[in-house]
Amino acid sequence: MSNKDIRVVVGMSGGVDSSVTAYLLKEQGYDVIGIFMKNWDDTDENGVCTATEDYNDVIAVCNQIGIPYYAVNFEEQYWDKVFTYFLDEYKKGRTPNPDVMCNKEIKFKAFLEHALKLGADYVATGHYARIRRHDDGHVEMLRGVDNNKDQTYFLNQLSQEQLSKVMFPIGDIEKSEVRRIAEEQNLATAKKKDSTGICFIGERNFKEFLSHYLPAQSGEMLTLNGKKMGQHSGLMYYTIGQRHGLGIGGDGDPWFVVGKNLNDNVLYVEQGFHHDALYSDYLIASDYSFVNPSEIDLEKGFECTAKFRYRQKDTKVYVQRENENSIRVTFAEPVRAITPGQAVVFYNQEVCLGGATIDDVYKNEGQLSYVV
């Protein structure tokens, strides 16, 4: 089958990465369709309206490269699967990662299903990751060539079934090369700056945004020994290891968030970047997913490396089953500021094995006061 007989539906955001993705596939002779996903009703807020502007950029790029385009509305699915999860996690005192859930439920589920109905053989996105396809049909997900842009951390929940239908055309090139191609082809998005922040918040003030949906309750800010250091403005606004916004003056080392007590509405703080309370030996995680589950033996356990946040250096870990729903991840050496609600993502060199959601963090068999 030649490329012209293979239909690839590209998820286009109005950014340079997805624009170049569509361009490269068209150049390679595929039957390409561009789709703009509308996941958030920006008329809900008084924030900056970017969706219309982004869709106009998609239209401009698709017209330039000569492919058809559509807009598809996934607002309902996004609210049900991503945004309610996001709010529920904050209510529990955790720090969620909505990008992971968005990839799992929207971009590679709702969007993939929609694309297949359009006769797609594959979907493609502008993620910095790679797919390795084997002769027996199974696939592996590899880190993007541009180490600084690698996005496998956010794709850790994708299954074998999902990844077998996915292409990541820019995963093999550096971001600078993506920009160069866009400028060389004079694409409408060539000079557009990369978006930052959570997809549905955009450039808005996070604290203000969250306050629209969750009532904040101020409370005491204490050291672990009970010394009062001030007031916090709502536990949901703080994350483990946070330094800024505490309002603690005085001399000496800066202060950091080391824990939360939801029942008493207390925020725990301690002084010093390397304070003992910020370090842990192992964690318990749930909602684990592996790209090739048949190759993973949780009963026996296995060694690999892991990331606990995006762009963090890999840490050597040992992974084993804790119980029916959870895994235990033990670190080769103590790790600082691991945060419940975030993803732990596993790697074997350049291969991303999968990931899980961090629930509890321990030191010397004792649970840290991260969320009590």
Swiss-Prot record:
Residues 97-99 are annotated as: Interaction with target base in tRNA. Its EC number is 2.8.1.13. Keywords: ATP-binding, Cytoplasm, Disulfide bond, Nucleotide-binding, RNA-binding, Transferase, tRNA processing, tRNA-binding. One of its GO terms (cellular component) is cytoplasm. It is found in: Cytoplasm. It is an enzyme of class 2 (transferase). The active site is at C102, C199. GO terms for biological process: tRNA wobble position uridine thiolation. ATP binds at G11, M12, S13, G14, G15, V16, D17, S18, M37, G126. Disulfide bonds join C102-C199. Residues 149-151, 309-310 are annotated as: Interaction with tRNA. SUPFAM superfamilies: Adenine nucleotide alpha hydrolases-like. The keyword Cytoplasm applies. It catalyses: S-sulfanyl-L-cysteinyl-[protein] + uridine(34) in tRNA + AH2 + ATP = 2-thiouridine(34) in tRNA + L-cysteinyl-[protein] + A + AMP + diphosphate + H(+). GO terms for molecular function: ATP binding; tRNA binding; tRNA-uridine 2-sulfurtransferase activity. InterPro entries: MnmA-like, MnmA-like_C, MnmA-like_central, MnmA-like_central_sf, Rossmann-like_a/b/a_fold. The record marks H127, Q342 as: Interaction with tRNA. It comes from the Bacteria. Belongs to the MnmA/TRMU family. Catalyzes the 2-thiolation of uridine at the wobble position (U34) of tRNA, leading to the formation of s(2)U34. This is tRNA-specific 2-thiouridylase MnmA. The lineage of its organism: Bacteria, Bacillati, Bacillota, Bacilli, Bacillales.
